[in-house]
Amino acid sequence: MDVSENTIHGAVSWAHGKEIIHSFGGNVLVYGRSMMKPLMMKPFVDVLEDMSWDQKAISCSSHNGDTEHVSTAQSLLSESEWGLMQCPLDVPLIQFGRQVRRPRRWFHTCSGEHAAVLKGMRKMGMNRAGYTLPNSPWFPLYLDVLREYMGKPEWQPLRVAKDGCGFPTLSLIHISEPTRRYRI
C-alpha cells in the first residue's frame, strides 16, 4: 500500500485594532509559491506573445501530468532543449491501477512554467545555465514586476527560498501583516 505523507506548517493570527490578540504557529513568513506564476511570466510577455492559449495557460499554472498537459509543456521547447529542464522528477498525479510510469520532469506540476521561462530566456538572449537560481538574469526582472505591482520601487523580499519545483520563492510578508490589514 502506498502512503502519501505531507507536512504543512500553518499559522493563524487575529487582531483587534492594532493589537494582535492571538497568534498560533508564530509570526511566520508567508511565501507566494505557485500563486506567483503569472507574475513570474510577466518579464517574458513581449517575447512570448506568439504562444498559443494552451501554452500560455500551462506556463502560468500547475498541471496533473496528463498527456495533454505534458504535450503542451513539451511544445514550448525544441527536443534538444529538454535536457535544460531542472524541475524535479515526478509521476502523473492521476493514474489508475498499478504505477507503470517512471518519474519524469515533464510530469512535474510546474514543467510548463519551467519550459516557458527557458523559452523566454532564449528569446531574450539570456544565459540559461542555472535558470532556477536567484542570480539568474530573469530574476531581477521578476523582482521589478513585483515592485511595480506593489508600488514600492525599493522593495526587497524578506527572504528568498527554494520552492518545491526548484524556482526561487519569495517571502512577501509576515502572517501578522494581513491580520492587521483585514482586522475588524
For the regions a protein language model found, what residue spans apply to each?
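Active-site-adjacent helix/loop patches that line small-molecule binding or acyl-intermediate pockets
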Residues: 54-153, 157-165, 172
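Active-site SXXK
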Residues: 32-49, 68
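Beta-lactamase-like hydrolase cores
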Residues: 1-29
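Contiguous, well-ordered alpha-helical segments that form the cores/surfaces of helical PPI scaffolds
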Residues: 10-13, 38-46, 116-120, 173
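Glycine-/proline-rich flexible loop or hinge segments
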Residues: 21-27, 51-61
